Amino acid sequence: MVLMKDEVEVIGFDDAPFNKADKVCILIGTYMRGNRIIDGIYFRKFKKDGMDVTEKIIDIVKEKHYKKIKVIFLAGITFGGFNIADLWEINKETEKPVIVVIDKYPNKEKIFLALKKYFDDADERIKLINSFPEPEKMENIYVQYVGADKEFVKNVIKKTKLKSKIPECLRISHLIGRGFLGLR
């Protein structure tokens, strides 16, 4: 069994909803201790359908709480359309485990068709997605993880959930993102 304190420090990233006409999107990172104490909320702009969300995530993680953060949670591998977070690069640059949490198993065939239809660099994006571990069912969610083992992932998710099936840091980042809808 992996021993972990209840107030394990984690950060969870999600994006705010966006419109088709938007050129930039908003990334939200919520830094928490366990499942109850919020110690920071961070924002970055990134390009819709670009390839810069990875550097924005790394930038936030390396900011104020770098030494305290034990785990990076992502609400999926794509942000702002098809801006793909490179799990390997985030793990390498931050030296932190990266855990992706999603509700449903992704339809890769549909994703790859969309990439091929709209992106000149579709092959590069598809190669990146295929390099990631396959999503794995864990209770009622799917997870992908880099830099950690299954037992660690189960334990940290358990410690960081409250009443939802996902870690609180992701739930709060999502709620904050939804709040941006009123600004449009």
UniProtKB/Swiss-Prot annotation:
InterPro entries: Endo_dU. Pfam families: DUF99 (PF01949). It comes from the Archaea. HAMAP family: UPF0215. Belongs to the UPF0215 family. This is UPF0215 protein MJ1150. It comes from Methanocaldococcus jannaschii (strain ATCC 43067 / DSM 2661 / JAL-1 / JCM 10045 / NBRC 100440).
